Each structure stands twice: as structure tokens, then as C-alpha cells.
């Protein structure tokens, strides 16, 4: 009798689905939340990219109020920034940071070229370099802070940090915030004569 009961229990599969469901569900939920969070980040990145491109075009117009341009970008990102605040660098949730650099032309949007005689990837040991901004020192970013003048090439960058939609990142020990960034490079409208900084040759320290 007892042996028959044991054999019947061994063959009985009722309730197995519930146990399997209980084991699989948490893993599936984590995967779904992680996927949704990634998709939302891609969506936010596309919105930010479009907003920055539009803002960059607005900034190239003579007399443009750059603070108003920034405000428009932040407004377009209201789904991420319920109570936005400016903070540079943008490292905490619901903060944003904008940066503008001006160059004489598109080729200057790069580290100043230098002769790497010792092949260490650094400008040092008296190596000659092209001082694009004529400030006497080698610069990884030779751009001048700000929007620049007529005909200048302006690099506009907006960085936004927001809190993840789901707690998956925190559960995995990662940061509870995500940071996205978008940049646009445009030439200012030639509403006046452009002032070009002459390039001189310098030596690395």
C-alpha cells in the first residue's frame, strides 16, 4: 500500500508548473525590466540628440540667447528631468550640463597636432606642436569657451543624468543613475567678419 502510494507520488506532476513558474518568474522579470530600461535609454538618447541638433541650429543665429536655448533642450527632456537643475559635471539624478566651444574651422576640432618623437602619445620633452589657439601651451581641446563669433565653428554638447526607471542596476550593484550625452557641430552664420587666430609653432614642456 505504501509502496503503491510512493510510486503514484513519483508519477504525479501536478503543481510542478507552479514551482517552475516561481523559479523562472524573478529571472524573467529582471530581464524584462533590464530590457525596458535599455530601450528607454535609447529612446531618451534619440530625443536628446534631436533636441541638441535643433538647439545647435538656433545657437548659430546672431544674438541667440544660449541660456534660452539650453532651457528648450531641458524642456524637451521633461520625461527624464521632472525637477531639473544645472550641475557641471552632471553626475547626480535630474541634473544637466551644457558646454560650448568655438573653433576657427572644422579641422581645429581635435587635439593640437604635435610631433611625437618618443612615441609615448604625449606632447612632452620639447616636441614641437601647432599652437592652434596661440596660448603658448599644448591643448587636447584648443577651442575657446563659448559660442564664438561670425563664421566660427561651434561645438555644442548637452549632458543629462537621470534615475533608472527600474531598480535592476541597483540590485546588480551598479549606479542608480544613467548619463546620456549629445553633441552637434555647426558653423555660425556669417553675420560679421570672422576673426581668425593665427597658428604658431610651440614646443612641449
Q: Each predicted region: which residue ranges?
A:
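Short, conserved structural patches
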Residues: 3, 53-205
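Alpha-helical assembly-interface signal, strongest on the long, hydrophobic N-terminal helix that forms
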Residues: 1-80
Amino acid at each position: 500500500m505504501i509502496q503503491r502510494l510512493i510510486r503514484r507520488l513519483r508519477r504525479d506532476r501536478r503543481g510542478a508548473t507552479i514551482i517552475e513558474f516561481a523559479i523562472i518568474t524573478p529571472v524573467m522579470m529582471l530581464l524584462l525590466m533590464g530590457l525596458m530600461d535599455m530601450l528607454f535609454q535609447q529612446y531618451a538618447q534619440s530625443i536628446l540628440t534631436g533636441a541638441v541638433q535643433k538647439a545647435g541650429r538656433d545657437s548659430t543665429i546672431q544674438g541667440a540667447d544660449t541660456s534660452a536655448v539650453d532651457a528648450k533642450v531641458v524642456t524637451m527632456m521633461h520625461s527624464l528631468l521632472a525637477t531639473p537643475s544645472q550641475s557641471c559635471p552632471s553626475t547626480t539624478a535630474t541634473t544637466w550640463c551644457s558646454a560650448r566651444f568655438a573653433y576657427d574651422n572644422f579641422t581645429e576640432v581635435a587635439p593640437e597636432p604635435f610631433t611625437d618623437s618618443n612615441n609615448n602619445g604625449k606632447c612632452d620633452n620639447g616636441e614641437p606642436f601647432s599652437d592652434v589657439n596661440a596660448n603658448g601651451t599644448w591643448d587636447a581641446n584648443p577651442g575657446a569657451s563659448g559660442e564664438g563669433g561670425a563664421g566660427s565653428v561651434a561645438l555644442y554638447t548637452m549632458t543629462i543624468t537621470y534615475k533608472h526607471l527600474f531598480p535592476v542596476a541597483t540590485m546588480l550593484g551598479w549606479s542608480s543613475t544613467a548619463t546620456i550625452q549629445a553633441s552637434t557641430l555647426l558653423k555660425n552664420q556669417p553675420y560679421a567678419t570672422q576673426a581668425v587666430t593665427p597658428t604658431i609653432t610651440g614646443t612641449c614642456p
